[in-house]
From Swiss-Prot:
Substrate binds at D96, S97, G98, G99, F100, D150, Q193, G220. The keyword tRNA processing applies. This is Queuine tRNA-ribosyltransferase. Its EC number is 2.4.2.29. It comes from Streptococcus pyogenes serotype M6 (strain ATCC BAA-946 / MGAS10394). Its cofactor is Zn(2+). One of its GO terms (molecular function) is tRNA-guanosine(34) queuine transglycosylase activity. The keyword Ion transport does not apply. The active site is at D96 (proton acceptor), D270 (nucleophile). NCBIfam families: Q_tRNA_tgt, tgt_general. Keywords: Glycosyltransferase, Metal-binding, Queuosine biosynthesis, Transferase, tRNA processing, Zinc. The gene is tgt. It is an enzyme of class 2 (transferase). Catalyzes the base-exchange of a guanine (G) residue with the queuine precursor 7-aminomethyl-7-deazaguanine (PreQ1) at position 34 (anticodon wobble position) in tRNAs with GU(N) anticodons (tRNA-Asp, -Asn, -His and -Tyr). Catalysis occurs through a double-displacement mechanism. The nucleophile active site attacks the C1' of nucleotide 34 to detach the guanine base from the RNA, forming a covalent enzyme-RNA intermediate. The proton acceptor active site deprotonates the incoming PreQ1, allowing a nucleophilic attack on the C1' of the ribose to form the product. Zn(2+) binds at C308, C310, C313, H339.
Length: 380
């Protein structure tokens, strides 16, 4: 690859950890890192307008290749002028490869060297996704950052299976690079796999780094392993990745996991967590999680989070938001979703300042002491 639509600029490494302060330059703008990326599965972040996402400070959003391929179709989106125009978002977009959804949503999967045959989860029809097809779909979507097609083995699968899987993923990555028809305006990332096996992560990283991708994703985590196991994998994986390229931890959105990922040198994160739990009335606050539907909030006229300056907390009370959710009013979900997204995007803003000030470990301790991390919050 001779041209570089995606560029990473390292501004500072924190003195006491591997945390990196930087920025990523894309064809649709520059965003600071570390950054949490809201997920817009169906070309929309659920209940949020583009204007609201900009007010939150979302410098980049993620959309899902698998879902947009099935509905409304990548060719239709291309005819509309590309995903940015289709959804009226003029800032950077990252698309995944569709691989994770194939393995997690689709039925009757059959994995071969050529690709994956599976049943469409919407109508049961037979579908086939190959490395070349995954790249073609993303080329049609026109995202700024694309992902190679990979297999995401379960964390506790046997060693021999995972070894064969990562070797196939490396061959798929090479095929995807060759199929990429828009290298001048779309950056392609490779995805490091290997479950919890250090030697396989090392092999996967070496294969992909040799292909000179514009960035590297760490896949196969946040799939049921413990927080400690995730950190252990990051401890031996991120040092294998080039310092001059972005590092992206896929599918992670719990506050402690974000901070611990940053400490280990990760630059980008995404997760559906903030909007998913918001729809059930669970809110992230500086004092821990808050389940707003609880009866004790029926006459609580204070904000969701006393330390939050988001639109929701500046204008609406716990009692009002609880009323909306109990009445099944969509506006309640909009308010809780806005708040949760703001909470994580703003957390990353505070993390960036802590890196600048060389006090990230102190920030982590103070944050988690207030947040009250325990087993009940661990998956939150």
């Amino acid at each position: 690859m001779t041209d570089y639509p995606i560029k990473y600029r390292l501004i500072k490494t924190e003195k006491h950890t591997g945390a990196r302060l930087g920025e990523i330059i894309t064809p649709h703008g520059t965003f600071p890192t570390p950054m949490f990326m809201p997920v817009g599965t169906q070309a929309t972040v659920k209940t949020q307008s583009p204007e609201e996402l900009k007010a939150i400070g979302s410098g980049i959003i993620l959309s899902n290749t698998y879902h947009l391929w099935l509905r409304p179709g990548d060719e239709l989106i291309a005819r509309s002028g590309g995903l940015h125009k289709f959804m009226n978002w003029d800032q950077p977009i990252l698309t995944d490869s569709g691989g994770f959804q194939v393995y997690s949503l689709a039925d009757s999967r059959n994995i071969t060297e050529e690709g994956v045959t599976f049943k469409n989860h919407l109508n049961g029809s037979k579908m086939f996704l190959s490395p070349e097809k995954a790249i073609s779909i993303q080329n049609n979507l026109g995202s700024d950052i694309m992902m190679s097609f990979d297999e995401c083995p379960q964390f506790y699968q046997p060693y021999d299976y995972v070894k064969k899987s990562i070797e196939r993923t490396s061959r798929w990555a090479e095929r995807g690079l060759k199929a990429h028809r828009r290298p001048h305006d779309q950056g392609l990332f490779g995805i490091v796999q290997g479950a919890g096996f250090e030697d396989l992560r090392r092999q996967s990283a070496a294969d992909l780094v040799a292909m000179d991708f514009l960035g590297y994703s760490i896949g196969g985590l946040a799939v049921g392993e413990s927080h400690e196991e995730m950190n252990a994998v990051l401890d031996f994986t991120t040092p294998l990745l080039p310092e001059n390229k972005p590092r992206y931890l896929m599918g992670v959105g719990a506050p402690d996991s974000l901070i611990d990922g940053v400490i280990r040198g990760v630059d980008m994160f995404d997760c559906v967590l903030p909007t998913r739990i918001a729809r059930n009335g669970t809110c992230m606050t500086s004092e821990g999680r808050l389940v707003i539907k609880n009866a004790k909030f029926a006459e609580d006229f204070t904000p969701l989070d006393h330390d939050c300056d988001c639109y929701t907390c500046q204008n609406y009370s716990r009692a009002y938001i609880r009323h909306l959710l109990k009445a099944d009013e969509t506006f309640g979900i909009r308010l809780t979703s806005y708040h949760n997204l703001y909470f994580l995007v703003n957390l990353m803003k505070k993390v960036r300042q802590a890196i600048m000030d060389d006090n990230l470990l102190e920030f982590r301790q103070d944050f988690l002491e207030r947040y009250g991390y325990n087993k009940s919050n661990r998956n939150f």
